[in-house]
């Protein structure tokens, strides 16, 4: 009798333990599934944002967004978009924000911004054997830029001192198209963020030179639509401030070979 009762007690205890474990796992899974999502619109702008060999989002902006969302209790969802449709997608609510090496300069009143979280140097690149040596040599030439970029604004609106009047400005949907235009001699030069242009040119196997003069410096931020959730923006801003203060932002950027003393202090590394 004692033996049967003992075996029954052990069996009941095991069943209760298993039930508790299943309950805990279920709660944990449910909690993870119920995390609010932050849908981030981005495009191919390596090393800031790109798709790796496994088809997963990667890059400096991706890593920063993942860590910021972890601290906020959000799940980041990265959506590769056509950059020239960014405002339509933002207004429709299909994406919550734009986070992809996006310049705040000249667009301060167009979006509700979080940032700047980083700074970037704007450069002009030419093929290695190009006769173009200085910014002034671009007068009457053709330049390719990424649509929506600081470079686009600069060359279309002549918003920076020392940038000459060029003959044509080709605004292309992503940086890979910009580099292709330069490589195939469709344009005389291309312009954009130094780190991104350098990375794309190297990956494309293009022999290139940067002109000695930088034509601008850009503040990079995360763009939300006007009238969007202010509490969400404040949470993101607080998370980024914490990451900067505790050195997390610097560690993420250093993993990509970035000189953080310059990009976090107002300039980009050479």
Regions found by a protein language model. Name each.
Residues 35-59:
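Short glycine-rich His-centered loop
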């Amino acid at each position: 009798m004692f033996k049967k009762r003992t075996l029954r007690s052990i069996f009941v205890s095991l069943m209760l333990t298993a039930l508790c474990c299943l309950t805990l796992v279920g709660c944990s899974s449910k909690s993870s599934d119920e995390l609010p999502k932050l849908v981030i619109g981005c495009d191919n702008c390596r090393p800031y944002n790109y798709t790796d060999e496994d088809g997963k989002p990667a890059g400096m902006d991706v890593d920063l967004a993942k860590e910021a969302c972890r601290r906020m209790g959000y799940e980041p969802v990265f959506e590769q978009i056509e950059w020239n449709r960014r405002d339509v997608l933002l207004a429709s609510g299909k994406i919550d924000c734009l986070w992809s090496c996006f310049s705040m300069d000249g667009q301060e009143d167009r979006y509700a911004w979080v940032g700047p979280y980083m700074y970037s140097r704007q450069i002009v690149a030419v093929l290695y054997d190009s006769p173009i040596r200085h910014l002034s040599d671009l007068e009457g030439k053709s330049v390719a830029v990424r649509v929506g970029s600081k470079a686009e604004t600069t060359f279309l609106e002549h918003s920076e001192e020392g940038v000459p009047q060029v003959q044509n400005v080709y605004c292309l949907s992503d940086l890979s198209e910009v580099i292709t235009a330069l490589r195939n001699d469709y344009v005389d030069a291309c312009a954009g963020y130094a780190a991104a242009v350098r990375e794309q040119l190297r990956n494309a196997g293009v022999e290139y030179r940067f002109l000695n003069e930088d034509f601008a410096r850009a503040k990079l931020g995360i763009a939300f639509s006007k009238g969007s959730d202010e509490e969400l923006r404040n949470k993101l801003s607080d998370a980024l401030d914490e990451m900067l203060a505790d050195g997390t932002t610097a560690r993420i950027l250093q993993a990509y070979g970035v000189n953080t003393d310059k990009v976090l202090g107002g300039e980009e590394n050479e």
